[in-house]
Amino acid sequence: MVGIPTRGIELTEVLEKELFSRTGLRVRKGTIDPTFYRDDQNRVGTRLIQAADIPTPIEQKEILLIDDVIYTGRTIRAAMDALYSWGRPQRVMLLVMVDRGHRELPIQPDFCGKKVPTSKIESISLRLNNVDNEEGVFLE
């Protein structure tokens, strides 16, 4: 499992703990920051860059890429470019908690918690207890 900043990393932690509590299965988890691979940096602004943490070689491994919300698909495309700079996985699957539509690239999640159609001027945020002291999906 590989989380994308910011909430994708926290979501990866939550999912890893839940998977272990239900199955006893431990999975390796990591993080990948797509910032340097984005094609829209001037539009999304700047933020603190997080170092990638890929704990194992990814060659011929199945990778579950995790993010909180999918919108245009640009973050996922950039994250996949960053991931492939570490090697060539056998398969990459995508898990998101919320799909709000409005894709600009042909990228679709393999696993989606909820589809929440929004207008382009609205935004959605995922809040998690371990970070935000509240839990839910919020339309803003």
Predicted regions and their residues:
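PRPP-associated nucleotide enzymes
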Residues: 1-140
